[in-house]
Design a protein with these regions (language model features):
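Conserved donor-binding loop and adjoining core beta-sheet/short helix segment
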Residues: 2-87, 199-229
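Short, surface-exposed connector motifs at secondary-structure boundaries
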Residues: 71-75, 140, 243-250
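Non-catalytic accessory segments adjacent to catalytic cores
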Residues: 76-104
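Short catalytic-loop micro-motif centered on adjacent basic/acidic residues
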Residues: 79-80, 144, 250-253
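Acyltransferase donor/substrate-recognition loop-hinge adjacent to the catalytic core
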Residues: 97-172
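Active-site/acyl-donor-binding loops of N-acyltransferases
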Residues: 100-120, 252-296
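A mid-sequence, solvent-exposed acidic-amphipathic segment
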Residues: 156-215, 219
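Aromatic (often tryptophan-rich) hydrophobic motifs at membrane interfaces
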Residues: 193-283
Length: 296
């Protein structure tokens, strides 16, 4: 498995924001759903089945053929997304001519030099250092690692953030992500997750959660900070990295999902690598759509 964590397989329909948790989602199974596949995770949203699979050791052709058959059973169009360039080459080599690949900028991963995020050295991080310093001066804050004793505090932050951003109780990505966060905390240790929590005047106000992908790469899945505290995101970002991620070469902070503010924020930290991601559709289905459009 590389720095990206996983390949994601889904069918036609609106992409859900649940995929903030992409590589950990592979190992979460909702207790209310029957298991139909081995090493696959199925989620239901907006009436469409979303399927995720990791490309790693094993027979790639048999994995893809399995979900192709299932998509056909459901009468759904088939799509792969979150593919690296290397993975598109693997697919093309394994099943030549079957897929049409397209760059998906919204799904591309932001990968940072860990030392740059920890030390914020140099002119290009001048504004970040000042922002962090203002937070540290302005608030009575404390940091702690996430443990079973503060899981509830983190979930409370996630819920309050969801309410503040108008997502809870709605069929949108914000509510889906909050669901994924709660699922993650139910199996935190089993998933080998780790994270950090910030408090202001004793109140839990921000947390971050991730996992080690390999000895050189740490992947951050979730980062939530409540409104009303200037510099809070900068603070949780810095404190967790400084106290826990010194020994990693890279920190993968995942994609921006095409959200303008999120893209601006992630670019402002000067990623060392913007890892391009691709989607793949069946050439046969793409050609059918093109023919229909031409007829109409």
């Amino acid at each position: 498995m590389d720095a990206t964590g996983a390949i994601r397989i889904r069918w036609d329909g609106e992409r859900v924001r649940l995929w903030y948790a992409v590589s950990l989602v592979l190992r979460i199974w909702h207790a209310g759903l029957p298991a139909r596949w081995t090493n696959l995770a199925l989620f239901w949203s907006t009436g469409q089945p979303d399927l995720s699979d990791s490309i790693g050791p094993g027979d790639l052709r048999s994995k893809v053929e399995l979900v192709l058959a299932d998509a056909k059973d459901y009468g759904c169009k088939f799509r792969l997304w979150g593919l690296t360039k290397q993975e598109t080459e693997q697919l093309e080599q394994t099943m030549p001519g079957m897929f049409r690949f397209q760059l998906d900028r919204d799904a591309s991963d932001y990968i940072y030099d860990s030392q740059a995020l920890i030390h914020l050295s140099g002119r290009k991080y001048h504004g970040k250092r000042n922002h962090l310093a203002r937070f540290q001066r302005s608030y009575n804050w404390s940091y702690e690692d996430i443990t079973p004793q503060n899981y509830a505090d983190c979930k409370a932050i996630a819920h309050e953030w969801c309410v503040q951003n108008g997502g809870c109780g709605k069929e949108d990505g914000t509510d889906n992500e909050n669901c994924a966060i709660n699922m993650a905390f139910r199996s935190f240790e089993e998933l080998a997750l780790s994270g950090g929590l910030l408090r202001v005047d004793g109140k839990p106000v921000a947390f971050t959660v991730g996992e080690e992908i390999n000895p050189e790469v740490y992947l951050l899945h979730f980062e939530k900070a409540l409104n009303g505290y200037e510099g809070l995101y900068a603070a949780i970002n810095h404190e967790y990295a400084a106290k826990n991620l010194e020994n990693y070469r890279y920190i993968n902070r995942e994609e921006d999902l095409g959200i303008e503010g999120l893209r601006k924020a992630k670019l402002s930290y000067n990623p060392a690598i913007l890892l391009e991601k691709y989607s793949a559709t069946l050439r046969s289905e793409t050609e059918e759509i093109t023919e229909l459009e031409q007829k109409n």
